[in-house]
Design a protein with these regions (language model features):
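Conserved C-terminal structural/oligomerization subdomain of aldehyde/semialdehyde dehydrogenase
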Residues: 2, 37, 46-51, 244, ...
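ALDH superfamily catalytic-core signature
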Residues: 10, 217-357
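Structural signal for hydrophobic packing residues in well-ordered secondary-structure cores
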Residues: 39, 43, 58-61, 65, ...
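Hydrophobic packing residues within well-ordered alpha-helices of enzyme cores
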Residues: 72, 173-176, 202, 222, ...
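Rossmann-like NAD(P) dinucleotide-binding subdomain of oxidoreductase/dehydrogenase enzymes
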Residues: 115-253, 377
């Protein structure tokens, strides 16, 4: 998807389908026009219709759980069934239930302050209304979670949606395209896979709102394409995520919680911890606790519960990241001991990287895998300074029992 959309950055053409454009572009435009006309015919669905749409969305997922899990596993090569159930199924259905419970309240008009100097005697109301047709560009790492949670918001607000999945989610895209017509008409919900040109054309469509989740580089291209139509764009981009561990906090607990998420989905989570700042007196203990955690919880990466890296390119990127760090003086520790990575199955062991420097790739690029930098620090001030030494801040974690101090540290992290 990244390579396909990258070409959009310089596009200046109006978003119409010329004679030489692909069938993909024509299909996208036809789907958009169908949804646009349906929206104009019924612009503000009532509470009953929105609840029906949300519960239908829930049925689409809950009635096809095994097929969805199998499709995601096929796309990954191997995806832990337990991880898919938790991250893609349970959380989504719970979110839909919560939205249904609160929807009536959220739809109510809201009062706002009126400047009586400019508008003497006036009253006002803010009335929530649908935008129209929304476009959702979904990444491969949690495709159901991100697609269905965004659809939950779109349908709750009374919108229609076109969803484009990643080129790494082809099996899931095929399944959802097959299942969806039994639950929603195409003028309400339409799915598209990435075939090499869809991303370009999708970003050109004059949606009422376009939501993109992915890399900053691709996000710039998406925004540039959408700008021609003045399409509002919401970007959820990647970045670096530090963790600061208070020396007074139980180190074993911090290690277990950080590594649980680091190995979840093989670390392919945008908000995952990239590097942990540990007091210099505790670094060796951190390493020891990390070894014990892996020995207990994921001793064999070839187990079906250990998720694969999504594709060969990503696997090579992780290898190159470690090679770059080693070549520039870092110490790399394979927490699986003598068990190397499995290239055929794209199983990558958890690694710790020590003594990193600013010129290493791992310090300037989102890791997006089971690699964790450990940086020893003398105090919290040094931890904050190093944590903020990046323009790519996305998320931050503070492990402490002192809530007041934790809040101060969290607000000091530039994310």
């Amino acid at each position: 998807m990244n390579q396909a959309i990258e070409a959009v950055a310089g596009a200046q053409e109006a978003p119409h389908v010329a004679a030489g454009q692909s069938a993909d572009a024509e299909a996208l435009r036809a789907a958009f026009q169908r949804q646009r006309q349906a929206y104009l015919s019924d612009p503000i669905p009532d509470l009953a219709q929105r609840r029906k749409d949300l519960l239908t969305l829930k049925r689409l997922l809950s009635e096809n759980v095994d097929q969805v899990i199998a499709a995601i596993c096929e796309d990954y090569g191997n995806r832990s069934r337990h991880e898919t159930l938790f991250a893609e199924i349970i959380t989504v259905t719970d979110g839909i239930n919560d939205t249904v419970r609160h929807l009536k309240k959220w739809m109510k008009p809201q009062r706002r302050h009126v400047d009586r100097t400019l508008y003497p005697g006036a009253r006002n109301r803010l009335i929530p209304q649908p935008l129209g047709v929304t476009g959702l560009i979904i990444p491969w790492n949690f495709p159901v979670n991100l697609a269905f949670s965004q659809l939950t918001g779109a349908f709750a607000a009374g919108n229609r949606a076109m969803v484009k999945l990643s080129e790494n989610s082809m099996a899931l895209a095929a399944l959802l395209k097959e299942l969806s017509p039994s639950y929603f008409p195409p003028e309400k919900l339409a799915w598209f896979e990435e075939t090499g040109g869809v991303g370009i054309e999708f970003s050109k469509i004059p949606f009422d709102l376009l939501v993109f989740t992915g890399s900053g580089q691709t996000g710039r291209a998406v925004m540039a394409a959408a700008a021609h139509n003045l399409t509002p764009v919401v970007l959820e981009l990647g970045g670096k995520s530090p963790a600061i561990i208070d020396p007074e906090y139980p180190l074993k607990k911090a290690v277990e919680r950080i590594l649980f998420v680091k190995q979840f989905n093989a670390g392919q989570i945008c908000t995952n911890v990239d590097y942990a700042f540990v007091h210099e007196s505790q670094r060796d203990e951190f390493i020891g606790q990390a070894r014990q955690y892996v020995a207990r919880h994921c001793p064999d990466i070839n187990n079906a519960d250990y998720t694969s890296i999504i594709d060969d390119r990503s696997y090579r990127r992780l290898e190159e990241t470690l090679d770059d760090a080693r070549g520039k003086g870092a110490t790399v520790i394979n927490l699986s001991g003598d068990q190397p990575g499995n290239r055929d199955q794209r199983k990558f062991p958890l690694h710790l990287v020590l003594d990193t420097t600013a010129n290493m790739t791992i310090r300037s690029r989102e890791t997006f895998g089971p690699i964790l930098c450990i940086q020893k620090v003398a105090d919290e001030e040094e931890a904050i300074r190093l944590a903020n030494d990046s323009e790519f801040g996305l998320n931050g974690n503070v492990w402490t029992r002192d809530k007041s101090r934790g809040y101060q540290l969290a607000t000091a992290i530039d994310t």
